[in-house]
Amino acid sequence: MHILNLGAGGFIGSHLTQRLLSEGHSVTAVDLWQEKVEDLLANPRLKFIRQDIREPGWNLDRLVQQADLVIDLIAYANPGLYIRIPLEVFRLNFTENLKIAEACVRHGKRLIQFSTCEVYGRSAASIETANLVDPEDPIHATFSEDRSEFILGPVCKHRWIYASAKQLLERVLHAYGLEHGFRYTIIRPFNFIGPKIDFLLSEREGIPRVFSFFMDALINGGQMKLVDGGTQRRCYTYIDDAIECTYRIVENPRGVCERQIFNIGSPYNEVSIRQMAEMMREIYAEKFAAPGAVLPDIVSVSGDEFYGKGYEDSDRRIPDITKARTLLGWEPKWNFRGLLEATMRYYVMEHRRAQKVEALQ
């Protein structure tokens, strides 16, 4: 197939592009950044286009028309941005992505749309005040694609604009399927992690995602900051597991993925953010730190202090992956410690390589 991969230069997009090429597909990759696919650019089946999709007049229709399949990964997916530039987050995640979907409708092309597990919002236990729900029972935080309610916070907590934009896009895709027979599949990722996930804070300005923030503190010094105590729980999924499931959706055996939504995540890897920080310190001390090295302190800060006013978070979310198991025969393989160590090793090796290059200059 010839596949148009929009957002191919990001974390998920770069790994997916590599897999698509390894399976023999040709790929037109569109992104603002090419650093994460630099090692793939020599492949004759890859065409990389540096493009900001917000610019007027770019050749979206022609690229969609030439493709057999369109994959859309383009998004602002960083809580710091939801707080600082909520309008731009909405415009990119809904308005610009809707243009891509409508181009697919016009030209009769199948679309794989990456959404987010954040559409589920908060768990039922987090808003129940009569003590009728056991907050420790995972059933109250396990989310199903076609049955679970969406529980988002108040409008003044504009952190939820990202989830709202993604949810609205999902609903429009569903409507196009109903009224126009549009062929789409929606993916809701649950906290993918792996090499190339993010930048380290010492390398550039901004607020990276939590793993990269902790990793930077371990490598370069500083505190491992837990937002609101790090009590939030997440189910982490190694990128290799995630890409395997995504590729099965690309293959679409017997058409089982048509107009379906899939959770991709590992329900077995639930940890609190505090537990993650503690395990990263433990692994770093055991595997990577110099003898006698001083490890960073783990400290708690408020969400308002770390991100700014308007921050709120989901307390807990666990994916129900029954659909992926049943329709795709997929099961995640990586446990939490294994995926954490593998990802940390990548960043440590990259840091050491950069140090050697710098020493030679």
Tell where the protein language model's regions lie, with residue ranges.
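N-terminal Rossmann NAD(P)H-binding glycine-rich loop of SDR-like oxidoreductase domains
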Residues: I3-E23
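Conserved glycine-rich Rossmann-like NAD(P)H-binding loop of the short-chain dehydrogenase/reductase
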Residues: H25-Q34
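Rossmann-fold cofactor-recognition segment
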Residues: P44-P56
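NAD(P)H-binding glycine-rich loop region in Rossmannoid oxidoreductase-like domains
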Residues: I53-L92, A103
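Conserved Rossmann-fold NAD(P)-dependent oxidoreductase catalytic core, especially the SDR/UDP-sugar
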Residues: L98-I161, T185
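NAD(P)-dependent short-chain dehydrogenase/reductase
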Residues: A125-A141, R171-R234, I239-V250, A277-Y284
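Active-site helix of classical SDR
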Residues: I161, A165-L168
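C-terminal substrate-binding subdomain of Rossmann-fold SDR/epimerase-dehydratase oxidoreductases
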Residues: L218-Q361
